[in-house]
Structure formats: C-alpha cells, structure tokens
Regions:
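A ligand-binding cleft/hinge motif common to bilobed small-molecule-binding domains
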Residues: 100-109, 175-177, 204-236
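N-terminal twin-arginine translocation
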Residues: 1-10, 15-29
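An extracytoplasmic/periplasmic, membrane-proximal ligand-sensing/linker region
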Residues: 32-34, 176-177, 217, 240, ...
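Hinge/capping helix and adjacent helix->loop/strand transition within the periplasmic-binding protein
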Residues: 85-90, 105-192, 241, 246, ...
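N-terminal (or domain-start) structured segment
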Residues: 26-115, 155-157, 180-203, 296, ...
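Short loop/turn segments at beta->alpha junctions
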Residues: 4, 75, 141, 188-190, ...
Length: 325
C-alpha cells in the first residue's frame, strides 16, 4: 500500500483533534526513565533538527527526557545495529528515513533485516522533492523533457548530491518509469550539485523543494514537476510528475522505529504521543519551515509504508546497478 499526500492530510486532520481528547493512556509505568532516540547521521541536518524538536516536545509533555544520540556511518546501519543491541523495552528508539529504506537493498547489513527486526512506531514528516532543470534547457514541461531525452539518449547529465542517496535514486526511478537514458553525474554535496546545474554542466536534478525553491523563484532554475502525489503549496503552479509518469511518487521520509519485541502498548503510546506532537501548531510550523509535511499515521500505516518503500527502492537499486565500494 502506497500512501498519497491526501491520506496523510486526512490523518493530519485526525491528529489535530488530539488536544481535545482526554489524556493519552500511559503504557503501564512507561516511561520511568529517559528515552534515547538514535540517529544515523551527523548533527545539524534537517532530519536531526526535526527529531530534536520532537524530542524536546515529548520531554515536556511526557515528563521524562527524550535524548537524541547521533551514531553516523554506513548510511544509518551503525545506528540501527546500536538500537538492535539494546533491550526491546521502548527506551531505545531509532530515527528511520529514506536512507534506511534504500540501504536495505543498496548496502544491506548481514546482522539485521530492517523489516524483520525493526518495529515501526510512528511517522514524523515527508520532505517533497522537485525536478528542476537549467533555465536554458529546451524542455519546459515533463512531457517535453521525456521527448527530448528519448530523442537524445545519453546526452543529458543528471546531477545529485551523491551516489546512492535519494537525490540520485529519485532520478533513477524517473529514468526507469519514463524509459529515458539520462547520465548520472554525481556531485559532492548540495552546493556542488547545484553549482553544476546552474553552470549547465548538468541539466537536471531531483532535489528537496526547500533546497531549490529560492533558485526557482529567482528564475535561475526551472521547475518541471514535483515528486509528490499532489501539488505542493509552495509551488502551486507546478504539476506533479505522476501526472505524466503514472505512479511516480517520491519524498524524503522521516519516522521512528524500535527493536522487534518492544511491547505493543509502549509502541501505541509512543505513536499517540508523537501524533499529538505533530498536531501542535508550533511543531507543525517548525516542520513546514524545514521543508517537511507532518506525517501523523497509525503504527500499522507506517509499517505498511516502510515495506512499500523498501520494495520500491529495491527495484530502483536493481535497475540502476549501483554498488557502493
């Protein structure tokens, strides 16, 4: 089951009602001590900021500290291993995101299986992407881009912030579904990739809207389509790619997981508390400012979403024939 933005917006409406409900039922005496949330990436990035924001809210509302711990390396696998070594008691949680879903196939860890060993707890947010081209590129729409690419196979360079991440595989998914031959020329980080695009060393990129919006608004880059299932508030005149490539949908995901065996009542309690946090106007405003659409869903929905994402990116990894050294 793939969740569209409409379904998430419906869930958001439900979550918005949480403040009017009675106090969320506590799972036995949980939490009786601080809770650790392990993040697989360095401090300071948008996912880190979002998780810390939510951890602060939870600490205030629950009455126990939620402590964020960064364990970067191996595309999130080091953090996952650290969480799986901890007791499955709800006191060690894992920040989950698109890198985890991609790495399940791209860089699998022999010590765990993401879907088998990690229990989905809650969604946090989705970061929409946009397909942008150099303004001198002849195509002004997604259909024109596809037609041009098919007439000029191998002559369009697609940049990204690095091999194997979502800016890369968003483009590979597009290539696979649109049937076009575009050459991936990775940059080393956001700045280099955008510089290559602005200088016309690359002609197309799939990038988070929050990173690209200023260039689009200034006319330095042209947006052809957003990667989400429905149009985006910040770019209301830009159509979805899925309008022309049926089924195409991508955005960066962020959520929380726990080790397999974590008590069900603890998982349900955490899910309810996180969803209540996402319904808080101050939290919602901060998330939107960081480029995220709040993602309040049930534990079961987030689990289905995890499985769908892992399966989707497994197909793309196979198509792209990417192997990390």
């Amino acid at each position: 089951m793939t969740f569209s933005r409409r379904q998430f917006l419906h869930s958001a409406t439900i979550a918005a009602a949480f403040p009017a409900l009675p106090r969320i039922a506590r799972a036995a005496d949980y939490p009786a001590r601080p809770v650790r949330i392990v993040i697989g990436f360095n401090a300071g990035g948008a996912p880190d900021v979002v998780v810390r924001l939510l951890a602060q809210w939870l600490s205030q509302k629950v009455g126990q500290n939620f402590i964020v711990e960064n364990r970067p390396g191996a595309g999130g696998n080091i953090a996952t291993e650290a969480v799986l070594r901890a007791p499955a008691d709800g006191y060690t949680l894992l920040e989950l995101g698109s890198p985890n879903f991609i790495n399940a196939t791209l860089s699998p860890d022999p010590n765990f299986d993401l879907i088998r060993d990690i229990v989905p707890v809650a969604g946090i947010g989705r970061n929409p992407f946009v397909m942008v081209v150099n303004p001198d590129f002849p195509a002004k729409t997604v259909p024109e881009f596809i037609a041009y690419a098919k007439s000029n196979p191998g002559k369009i360079n697609m940049t990204s912030t690095g091999t194997g991440n979502l800016t890369h595989f968003s483009g590979e998914l597009f290539k696979m579904m649109a049937g076009v031959d575009v050459v991936h020329v990775p940059g080393h980080g956001e700045m280099e990739a955008q510089t290559d695009l602005l200088a016309d060393r690359a002609q197309v990129m799939f990038d988070p809207i929050v990173s690209t919006l200023g260039y689009v608004q200034a006319g330095k880059l042209r947006a052809l389509g957003v990667t989400t299932a429905t149009r985006i508030e910040t770019l209301p005149d830009i159509p979805t790619i899925g309008q022309f490539v049926p089924g195409y949908e991508v955005d960066a995901q962020l959520g929380i997981g726990a080790p397999k065996g974590t008590p069900k009542d603890v998982v349900e309690y955490l899910n309810a508390q996180i969803n209540a946090g996402l319904a808080d106007p101050a939290i919602k405003q901060r998330l939107v400012g960081l480029g995220f659409v709040p993602m309040p869903v049930s534990q079961a929905q987030f689990g289905e979403h995890m499985t769908d994402e892992v399966e989707k990116w497994a197909k793309v990894v196979k198509f792209a024939r990417v192997k990390l050294e």
